[in-house]
Amino acid sequence: MKITCNAGGLTLKNPTILAAGVLGTTGASLKRIASMGAGAVVTKSIGTEPKPGHHNPSMIRLEEGYINAMGLPNPSFGEFRQELEIARESGVPVIASIFGATPEEFTAVANGLPGADAYELNVSCPHAKGYGMQCGTDPELVRSITKAVKAAVKVPVWVKLTPNVTDIRPIGLAAQEGGADAVVAINTLKAMAIDINTGWPILGNRSGGLSGPAVKPVAIKCVYDLYEVLDIPVIGVGGVSNWADAIEFMMAGACAVEIGSAVYEDIGTFASVSMGISNYLDRKNMKLDEIIGLAHRVVKQ
């Protein structure tokens, strides 16, 4: 079964996308992920100035995922521009993940990374003071950031949302009102781990963001809620490890899925997920569009 799809203004050969922050620091690594079957790739989040990130340990493994507190380390858009050009040789859409503290900073980064096939606005990182989630919990700021970037670029703009709110729907609606072509749900959940032998928080930043299979039920619910109120596409992310996870996200309303933590276990995840989706559709004699939002239609019958 053909599984080409349209995701937020981009045509993808399959509905799997590399999530921001995983093997997205160099053009070469992004090309490698594309060669392993990803339908599109998202870069590491890039800002206006070089940022070293938080002290180690910055990532720990749990039974059902990871907690990371990288702190948005990046070389700045000026230094990353060459990596983006290399990544564009991959043959798949390359989405630049960008962050800032104000609409003006977001716009400066977008203008400083010309050539991206789309921009993903990181208004959701939970462990970078002054950035990410501190912007993304304010609907008015999300709206103004989205509007500013949309006015500055001629390619699709996606907004990556935080789950660390009481209700994600007003944030999604604010992104839509600002002109977003899609929302991406979700970024990591605020989390922490403590060494019981010393009493010290394990991460250098003390707290971080939880990703992997542990967050999937939360992500599914967020996608489901957003699909009910938005007119723009929803891209699902959070705990996708296999084709069945991807199908579940699509039934909740996602038009495509981003994959992050699972790549640490198997770089071939994109190909296996795509093949699994195709085989599932063949068995069910269905088209990809028919499973998107299916859970909503079933409950209304």
Swiss-Prot record:
InterPro entries: Aldolase_TIM (IPR013785), DHO_dehydrogenase (IPR050074), DHOD_1B (IPR033888), Dihydroorotate_DH_1 (IPR024920), Dihydroorotate_DH_1_2 (IPR012135), Dihydroorotate_DH_cat (IPR005720), Dihydroorotate_DH_CS (IPR001295), Dihydroorotate_DH_I (IPR049622)
GO biological process, one term: 'de novo' pyrimidine nucleobase biosynthetic process
Record lineage: Archaea, Methanobacteriati, Methanobacteriota, Stenosarchaea group, Methanomicrobia
Residues at the active site: 125
Compartments where located: Cytoplasm
Main localization category: cytoplasm
Positions that bind FMN: 44-45, 122, 160, 186, 212, 238-239, 260-261
Organism expressing this protein natively: Methanocella arvoryzae (strain DSM 22066 / NBRC 105507 / MRE50)
Pfam family, one: DHO_dh
Pathway: Pyrimidine metabolism; UMP biosynthesis via de novo pathway; orotate from (S)-dihydroorotate (NAD(+) route): step 1/1
Family membership noted in the UniProt record: Belongs to the dihydroorotate dehydrogenase family. Type 1 subfamily.
Protein name as annotated: Dihydroorotate dehydrogenase B (NAD(+)), catalytic subunit
Cofactor: FMN
